[in-house]
From Swiss-Prot:
<comment type="similarity">
    <text>In the C-terminal section; belongs to the SNF2/RAD54 helicase family.</text>
</comment>
<dbReference type="GO" id="GO:0005634">
    <property type="term" value="C:nucleus"/>
</dbReference>
<dbReference type="InterPro" id="IPR024779">
    <property type="entry name" value="2OGFeDO_JBP1/TET_oxygenase_dom"/>
</dbReference>
<feature type="binding site">
    <location>
        <position position="479"/>
    </location>
    <ligand>
        <name>2-oxoglutarate</name>
    </ligand>
</feature>
<keyword id="KW-0238">DNA-binding</keyword>
<dbReference type="InterPro" id="IPR001650">
    <property type="entry name" value="Helicase_C-like"/>
</dbReference>
<feature type="region of interest" description="DNA Helicase">
    <location>
        <begin position="541"/>
        <end position="1098"/>
    </location>
</feature>
<keyword id="KW-0408">Iron</keyword>
<feature type="binding site">
    <location>
        <position position="465"/>
    </location>
    <ligand>
        <name>Fe cation</name>
    </ligand>
</feature>
<keyword id="KW-0547">Nucleotide-binding</keyword>
<dbReference type="Pfam" id="PF00271">
    <property type="entry name" value="Helicase_C"/>
</dbReference>
<feature type="binding site">
    <location>
        <position position="417"/>
    </location>
    <ligand>
        <name>Fe cation</name>
    </ligand>
</feature>
<dbReference type="InterPro" id="IPR000330">
    <property type="entry name" value="SNF2_N"/>
</dbReference>
<dbReference type="GO" id="GO:0005524">
    <property type="term" value="F:ATP binding"/>
</dbReference>
<dbReference type="GO" id="GO:0004386">
    <property type="term" value="F:helicase activity"/>
</dbReference>
<comment type="function">
    <text>Dioxygenase that catalyzes the first step of DNA base J (beta-d-glucosyl-HOMedU) biosynthesis by converting thymine to 5-hydroxymethyluracil (HOMedU). DNA base J is a hypermodified thymidine residue found in the genome of kinetoplastid parasites, which is localized primarily to repetitive DNA, namely the telomeres, and is implicated in the regulation of antigenic variation. Probably also acts as a DNA helicase. Recognizes and binds specific regions of the genome, hydrolyzes ATP and allows the DNA base J de novo synthesis.</text>
</comment>
<feature type="region of interest" description="Thymine dioxygenase">
    <location>
        <begin position="1"/>
        <end position="540"/>
    </location>
</feature>
Length: 1098
């Protein structure tokens, strides 16, 4: 009997034989018998272990190990191997030992492997090559001798390769139909054969009661359509039936009017323009086009043909009375509209008129295409940006317009158009009528444009404009005009998610009840106007609706050779979105390279995510990342890539995950490196002014740039401008830096407390939001559990107050304090921490607590301790050593409050993360909690990636580990600690986004419990940090939310401890307020809800 085959003949052999196959990689032959079991027993146990089964030899069954590669990956490898030279075959076999096998690791999770998966893959490659080479007359004889020809996907791959190489479709079984062009990798024929034998066995032993059908014997067994997407990711109602659509006619908001009284313009004071012209907002550098006038731009017959249809949309049921002297005018909306503020289920859709009259709309097509052509010729930059931004689903007749406003006999008062795409222009044309006057006047230009039937005006609709008087209105004047534009709301995350759910429903309708056998699925296939978006079939159900929407947004932009910014709240899964995007691009362009830039601490997070989702089919043959753990492997991968670049090896696409500090060296090494796609994680770094990183990336000449950031705006609005300008260079041409800064200044002025700047701030806010909408996918909301965010103002002990006076920490002095001055922070932690810091004798907890008293008594300003200070420091050390912990803790308000929070969390058997900026504070917190016998683990910036991973694992798995102490500025990135549902920010940084990142370590996807955040501030240093934070938060909300916000005044903050709705928390606040420090000051002075530190203006 050949080596590796054995005959089962003992009563306990099935389990032991399968154990041997699984652990040794050898194959085994079994026969049905009372001692082994029937066919159902053999197949079900084999499937449970994910092993393979072949129906040979006659009367028996061959059990094979699980194939450690995905089906399509094995196909690609076999294709390469079959076409390779002998030397290249050796290299391919050697490379098998250098790669990862996540499927193998998963299948062996309960077994110890005695073989390398590369050995098994090598055998399959060699067999496929041999099968391709044998003469036609010998092919069928292999069927009885090779179990590989009875398992999928090896069987299909062999037939496929032979068809390509030899042109003969000789299949293992002549009765089988030819292999389809698109391979379906499953063991259907084997399963049918086995099922038939099993059915015969069951018919003989019918008294056994029957059994369920056998699943297809393949690692990828297919996915039912109902399981393709997760719950909530598929549209629930049929939009094609009129009964399901609410009639919202007239509820569209297209104007922004900022006055209680209608203001009408007259021709006096305006220059009348009658000749073709282009107008700019100012002369000189940085000017932008604001109006293009084209008299006779469209043939009159084309206009009147369109008017016959469009005039039917006009109605007096509308919200535009403010621009018509208080009475509703004759106006209507055609095309698509975003009803984001309406209480309706479907927000983004056709207007009622459009839905009922699409059949007539073809009469307007010629007019729209005429206007679109004029637009592209006379304002090409605006037109291109609008072409990039508009979702294909909302294009009217293939143009860059999504929406048309139709006005009849409507002399508009002064207004601006609300919700138009600000990187584009509105296109105005008169299409019917007999009248005189009623010119369109733009106030800032002091120009009025004569518009007769066929005349066209492209203009910036954010500028205040209105119609001049009608001449001889008593002559029954008639005038029909249209404005064509792109509604920015249609590009919102709400609309993107609605689109995605609709597409998912169409996909499921196409599939009907057919099981999905492909390992990948094009989730955009239902709409031919969309670019393909390939996702691993098993992964599709793991992607949340917001992730699917983000992917759709990105691929539409990259398909139009533009980049974009993905601004999603931390924890919503941006990394998975980016990896899926890489997968789709490599599926379409297998030889393309992708560059991912990420901060060094997050590289390991990318590797972990890649490994985690690999079990769902998200795998990459060449994923090169340096996380500091496998530097040798990283260098070997670079050498392999170098050989490809030198044409020594076949080209294969690589995904490089590197940090920005290494980028320069990488580009020096690979001078011809031309990535197809660049992804920048924590991409707000490319927004820094004069950034060398952007200079390096610009030299790569890659237009497909995707920025990932939960915090795209860190300090001021100019960062956002540089960020959007980096992903699409054309944006700065339509909104020069000077103009953007004027808008940002208007917002800043209001945010910082100037209520008189409210009107200008609103205008600027709306403009910036509409300008960036086409290039920024923003989703700041989430469906996570509740977040309770509190600001706890802690008291100071008499010792702390004494040192505050010594340092001159008055309010006046503190306003001038440099951000780099750490003394107040250490003092608010504990006087011991402060004294140790200024004496320069602090050692970490690894070395223990030591005090080196100075021999001389110098002044405090010399950073040496006075005698009394040295005695105090020694006294504090003794308190810790003698476990006089309450006495030690009560010298600091922050420490007292922190310890009580920790003990409360411990009593509830929950977990807590403590973030601090300073090593001294981290060490003191760790030492104090350890002395209290609270199991605590600390992760700091200098710690290795291995220690961080160990911390994540321990914190998740060890029930006794209650507290993690983390460095805010380092450990706040790339780590997930959803085991914790309490977060303490022991001190805060000037940038609120650093704190937001820290909170997101616990408050993120996969968090199942409500999360409570405690921000501890002292009465000294932290309130100035808080003022800086609230200003920036107000700015962020102004720009990324439709909220005009400002800093709350101190008098507006209300202590919420007494009206706390949670009884247990209310009692806890009362207990803290009743606790006194040394010197009889309360440990807790006030409790505020953090969100109330920023106020919305109504």
């Amino acid at each position: 009997m050949p080596s590796g085959l054995m005959r089962a003949n003992t009563s306990t052999e099935l389990e032991s034989i399968l154990d041997i196959v699984q652990s040794s990689g050898e194959i085994a032959v079994v026969f049905t018998s009372p001692s082994i079991g029937d066919l159902e027993t053999i197949t079900s146990e084999t499937q449970r272990r994910q092993l393979r089964i072949a129906g040979i030899p006659r009367g028996g069954y061959t059990i094979l190990p699980a194939i450690p590669l995905y089906d399509d990956e094995l196909l690609q490898m076999c294709e390469r191997y079959t076409a390779a030279s002998e030397h290249e075959k050796v290299e391919i076999r050697n490379s098998l030992y250098m790669r990862e096998y996540p499927l193998f690791a998963y299948s062996m999770r309960n077994q110890r492997a005695l073989f390398h998966p590369a050995d098994y893959v090598s055998r399959i490659l060699q067999f496929c090559f041999h099968y391709v080479q044998v003469p036609d007359e010998d092919v069928l004889s292999l069927q009885d001798r090779s179990p590989f020809l009875h398992i999928s996907p090896v069987k299909e791959i062999c037939v496929h390769l032979r068809l390509i190489v030899r042109g003969t479709p000789a299949a293992p079984d002549e009765s089988e139909s030819p292999v389809p062009e698109q391979l379906h990798f499953h063991a259907e024929s084997d399963a049918e054969k086995l099922a038939a034998e099993r059915a015969r066995a069951l018919s003989i032993a019918a008294s056994s009661g029957g059994a369920s059908e056998t699943e297809p014997l393949s690692l990828f067994t297919g996915v039912a359509p109902s399981a393709l997407f997760q719950k909530g990711a598929v549209e629930e109602v049929d939009l094609d039936t009129e009964e399901t659509i609410e009639d919202l006619t007239g509820e569209e908001t297209v104007d922004a009017v900022h006055s209680f009284h209608s203001e009408y313009l007259t021709l006096s004071g305006f220059e009348l323009v009658t000749k073709a012209s282009i107008f700019y907002d100012h002369e000189g550098e940085g000017q932008r086009v604001v109006a293009v006038y084209i008299p006779g731009g469209v043939p009159k017959e084309t206009c009147r043909a369109a008017a016959a249809v469009l005039e039917l949309a006009v109605t007096k049921k509308n919200l535009r009375a403010a621009t018509n002297g208080g009475l509703p005018p004759d106006t209507g909306i055609v095309g698509y509209y975003d009803y984001l503020t309406n209480p309706t289920q479907h927000k983004c859709r056709e207007t009622e008129f459009s839905r009922r009259n699409w059949g007539l709309f073809s009469q307007s097509e010629s007019l729209l295409k005429h206007l679109d052509k004029l637009y592209s010729q006379l304002a090409p930059t605006h037109h291109h940006l609008q072409r990039v931004a508009i979702p294909s689903q909302y294009q009217l007749c293939g143009t860059v317009f999504s929406t048309i406003t139709v006005n009849r006999n409507f002399r508009t008062a002064v207004h601006t158009d609300k919700g138009d795409f600000r990187s584009g222009l509105g296109v105005l044309s008169v299409i019917n009528g007999e009248f005189e006057g009623c010119h369109l006047a733009i106030k800032s230009l002091k120009k009025a444009f004569q518009l007769k039937v066929g005349d066209v005006l492209l203009f910036d609709t954010s500028l205040e404009h209105g119609n001049t008087e009608v001449v001889h209105p008593e002559n029954h004047w008639q005038r029909t005009s249209i404005v064509c534009y792109l509604r920015t709301g249609l590009m919102s995350s709400v609309c993107e998610m609605e689109r995605r759910k609709h597409l998912n429903r169409l996909i499921l309708q196409q599939l009907l009840n057919t099981e999905i056998r492909h390992t990948t699925v094009n989730i955009n296939e239902a709409d031919s106007s969309l670019p393909p978006l390939f996702v691993p079939t098993r992964l599709a159900s793991q992607l949340a609706p917001v992730q699917l929407a983000a992917l759709g947004f990105i691929v539409e932009r990259t398909n139009k050779q533009s980049g974009c910014v993905v601004a999603m709240t931390m924890g919503l899964g941006k990394t998975l979105v980016a990896l899926t995007l890489c997968f789709s691009h490599l599926h379409l362009a297998p030889q393309a390279d992708i560059l991912i830039l990420t901060p060094k601490p997050i590289i390991s997070h990318w590797v972990d995510e890649k490994n985690k989702w690999g079990m769902y089919g998200l795998h990459f043959p060449h994923f090169v990342a340096s996380d500091g753990l496998n530097s040798l492997e990283f260098e070997q991968q670079l050498l392999e890539y170098e050989r490809q670049k030198n044409n020594e090896k076949p080209k294969a696409g690589h995904v490089f995950v590197i940090n920005s500090e290494y980028l320069a060296g990488f580009l020096r090494r690979f001078r011809r490196f031309t990535p197809f796609l660049i992804i920048v994680d924590e991409g707000h770094r490319v927004a820094a002014k004069g950034n060398k990183l952007t200079e390096s990336l610009d030299r790569l000449r890659c237009n497909l740039r995707v920025v990932l950031s939960g915090t795209p705006l860190q300090n001021d609005a100019s960062e956002l401008y540089r960020l959007v300008g980096w992903v699409n260079k054309g944006v700065s041409k339509v909104l020069p830096p000077k103009r953007f800064q004027e808008l940002a200044n208007s917002i800043n002025q209001f945010v910082e407390g100037d209520d008189g700047a409210f009107y200008n701030a609103v205008m600027a806010q709306e403009y910036i939001q509409d300008w960036m909408r086409g290039f920024v996918f923003r989703e700041m909301e989430n469906d996570l559990p509740p977040l309770h965010d509190y600001l706890l103002v802690c008291g100071s002990s008499n010792v702390q107050r004494e040192y505050e006076e010594k340092l001159g920490l008055t309010e006046t002095a503190m306003t001038a304090l440099r951000a780099t001055e750490h003394r107040p922070h250490h003092l608010s932690t504990h006087p011991a921490c402060y004294l140790a810091f200024i004496s320069n004798c602090y050692q970490s907890m690894v070395s223990g607590w030591t005090v080196r008293a100075q021999s001389n008594t110098s002044r405090l300003r010399t950073t040496q301790l006075e005698e009394i200070d040295a005695m105090r420091l020694e006294q504090y050390a003794q308190m810790i050593e003698n476990e006089q912990l309450d006495a030690f803790i009560n010298v600091s308000g922050k420490m007292r409050v922190l310890v009580d929070i920790v003990l409360r969390v411990q009593a509830r058997k929950e977990k807590l993360i403590i973030f601090s900026l300073y090593v001294g504070s981290q060490d003191l917190i760790h030492r104090t909690l350890t002395a209290l016998r609270v199991c605590t683990f600390t992760v700091r910036g200098r710690d290795s990636q291995d220690r961080r991973r160990r911390a994540m694992h321990e914190f998740s798995e060890n029930k006794d580990l209650t507290v993690l102490v983390l460095s805010t500025k380092i450990a706040a990135y790339g780590l997930e600690f959803t085991a914790a549902n309490h977060v303490v920010l022991f001190d805060s940084w000037w940038n609120p986004q650093a704190d937001a990142q820290a909170i997101a370590r616990a408050y993120r996807r996969n968090q199942r419990k409500p999360v409570t955040v405690y921000r501890l501030i002292s009465a000294t240093e932290n309130k100035f940090v808080l003022r800086s934070q609230t200003r920036k938060i107000a700015l962020f909300k102004c720009i990324f939310h439709k909220r005009t916000t400002r800093q709350a005044l101190p008098s507006e903050l209300e202590d919420c401890s007494a009206n706390e709705t949670d009884n247990e928390r209310r009692d806890f606040w009362a207990k803290l307020k009743a606790t006194h420090l040394v010197g009889d000051t309360r440990a807790l002075l006030n409790v505020y809800r953090y969100q109330e530190s920023v106020r919305e203006s109504q």
